[in-house]
Amino acid sequence: MSAVLCETRPVLDVEPLLHLERLTKRYPGVTALDELTVKVPRGRVGLVGANGAGKTTLFRLLLGLAHPTEGRVEVCGIDVAADPIAVRSRLGYMPEHDCLPLDQTAADVVATFGELSGLPARVSRQRASDILDLVGLDEARFRPIGGFSTGMRQRTKLAQALVGDPELVLLDEPTAGLDPLGREEMLALVARLGSFGISVLMATHLLDDVQQVCDHVLMIDAGRLVVSGATDSLLERTGRVTVDVGIAGDALAARLAEVPLRTVVVEGLVEVELDDDDQLDVLRDVIAELGLPLHRLSTRLTSLDEVFLDRARTAVEP
């Protein structure tokens, strides 16, 4: 099943997956990307932003389908403007919208994409069979795509993105239109790609999907960089602690505001936002200093939704 993908090139850590330098793209009356500067490591990367944030524009620039107004972009260490063909040969692309010929079989479509990537016809057909098996379409590969469900069409699009043995696969909203089971199955497939030496850049507005399968997050909003970082570190340094000190909640919140720590009192419980473990130690010291009874102290990691909203809100504040 996975023999062909196991032969993918080894992952090299010398060059980042993406290197953007003041990357800007303007259309008449609209700045789609605004001086993005960031290095993104290899692995499974979530490209996060609301509709209109600039995700599709970035994909077009990576694929060489559009040219930046200013700045530059490197993919896998190669300048897209200098050698777009070399970049494209290392990429697979799964578009958001349905673009499959409905009268053809999945096997024929995926094999055709393999040949377009430069594979000999016989090799392409064998790879198509293996990849369709990998994505769970082995028994359906000779059926016309017109009879496929939404989930099966999404899997076919993923298969055509993988058949050319890419170093990086661009996934544009891969779980769009899927039911809960189909979504979980698609995310499981995305999670497996790293074991084959394939990096992933997954564009989505569903932060739960990113939190589930991505080890790095690139957040953009209105064409500007909001945050870039390892998923775990983003969540770890944005923890929230709920403290129960009985009727003294307001007194504790007032003292913590002097430190200062960000707090909110909800039904007598004090919620404290912490950036690191040192601030947790400060919280404990303040409780001891005031001599308050500590009935409960529980830690909850914030979600990526909260991280995104907090960073986006901070970015627009004067």
Language-model segments: residues:
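Conserved ABC transporter NBD signature motif
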Residues: G71-A82, V87
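Catalytic Walker B motif of ABC-type/P-loop ATPase nucleotide-binding domains
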Residues: V169-E173
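ABC transporter nucleotide-binding domain
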Residues: E185-L274
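Helix-to-loop junction immediately C-terminal to a conserved catalytic motif
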Residues: L63
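Conserved ABC ATPase "signature" region
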Residues: A111, E115, R122-A140
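Short, charged/small-residue-rich alpha-helical element at the C-terminal edge
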Residues: G239-R311, P318
